[in-house]
Amino acid sequence: MTAISNHIDTIIKLNPDYTQMDAVYLTNKLLNLIGDAALELPGDTDPLTNLDLMVKAAQDNGKIPDSQAARQILEAQLMDFATPTPSRINQLFWDKYQAGPRVATDWFFALSRANNYIQTRAIAKNVVFPAKTEYGDLEITINLSKPEKDPKDIAAAAHATQSGYPACALCLQTEGYAGRTDFAARTNHRVIRFLLGGKTWGFQYSPYAYFNEHAIFLDAIHEPMVIDQSTFSNLLNIVTMFPTYFVGSNADLPIVGGSMLAHEHYQGGRHTFPMAKAPIETQVEISGHPHVFAGIVKWPMSVIRLVSADSDELINAAEHVRQVWNQYTDETVDVRAFVDGKPHHTVTPIARRVGTEFQLDLVLRDNQTSAQYPDGIFHPHQDVQHIKKENIGLIEVMGRAILPARLKSELAEVQKYLLGEANTMKPMHQAWADQLKAKYDWTPANAEIQMQAAVGRVFARVLEDAGVFKRDEVGQKAFARFCRAL
């Protein structure tokens, strides 16, 4: 079989708008993209390997330049044929939804993987391991999935005219966008539309997923992130619509928010995070909401969990907690709602269904900085920034570390140092490595497992740094004072 015929089989399998009658038409469409010389190109039975063969043929035939961006743009164009149009996708999704939410999401997720929108091969490169801590098993990942920028693309982007379209990577306008040297190819990207709070929203998957069925729910309008009562309502409506998914929002302030504050969106998926498994350690009363169970979660960050079968009462209770926190100051533990009139408090909310009840976790956030902690008082402190210095966003709040790609090679050098081997360990790891060397015995047999455990302990410390009420006696008494204010 040829690469062309194999790809046509993939197209017909995934896209109901095409049949075998369209084979000649599709052959010509594909040849237009990869060159007539590829007509008899031998194929591969694996669709993604077959895709690689066609992209290489296009490069060999002079149809695309030798650059990463050009290859990715062509990959998306070739897989676009295998992807139904947005209107057809939406019709098929909501038809399947009638048989159950899970039926619809399973189908859309499988299609998003099969058409290479979800970059399964890149995601498989990530390093993932558990780490035992006093808070349960945390999840550590070293993110290797996002490709390094091609120097040719960086140079080309520097000379490219900026159109401002699409406004950002989350905008609905990315659906079907061809891509360019400085903007990802999205020809094969599709978004499910739905109504949320009387407005049009979109539901899609993340192309570089950080966990199972990593979904993004986005406002159809490009407007900034905000946390208010409508956020809690939206989150509970989403878990009502998709009960097998959790959903949460990043905070709406810099330092404690995510990397994309410019576009209102939430993230969810079918994954049980460590924080969801963490127990309540102290029950709390929320004034005026007797039917809402509330408690402090045993977690390195400061989390209040609200539980009720009544979503409206839960929304009102959450808004009460948010409003009290947004005005709350306790100078004894450096917690300040305002400094020079500027607000510093918000929450990171996470919703899930547990049987007939709704759970809403509210993680208290404070984005102050100080002379001692210029990156953030409640942000990873300098002594752990050799492992993690980026913002602690929604996914990490829940106990899954997203660590930078540099650590794969850097930790290997630390391990060599600990084993007394020749190494090129970076100076920023020296103090930590010396502590590890003094405290533990290192052998080739135990080095990897001990290194993973050590990274896990650092991540737990990172989360403790981000916690507004510390886990010591002073911090827990301060947390109790806040809870009495509720």
UniProtKB/Swiss-Prot annotation:
One annotated GO molecular function: UDP-glucose:hexose-1-phosphate uridylyltransferase activity
Keyword flag Cytoplasm: yes
Compartmental location: Cytoplasm
InterPro entries: GalP_uridyl_Trfase_II, GalP_uridyl_Trfase_II_CS, GalP_Utransf_C, GalP_Utransf_N
Entry EC no(s): 2.7.7.12
GO CC entries: cytoplasm
Pathway connected to this protein: Carbohydrate metabolism; galactose metabolism
Enzyme class: transferase
Superkingdom classification of source: Bacteria
Catalytic activity, reaction form: alpha-D-galactose 1-phosphate + UDP-alpha-D-glucose = alpha-D-glucose 1-phosphate + UDP-alpha-D-galactose
Family per record: Belongs to the galactose-1-phosphate uridylyltransferase type 2 family.
Entry protein name: Galactose-1-phosphate uridylyltransferase
Gene: galT
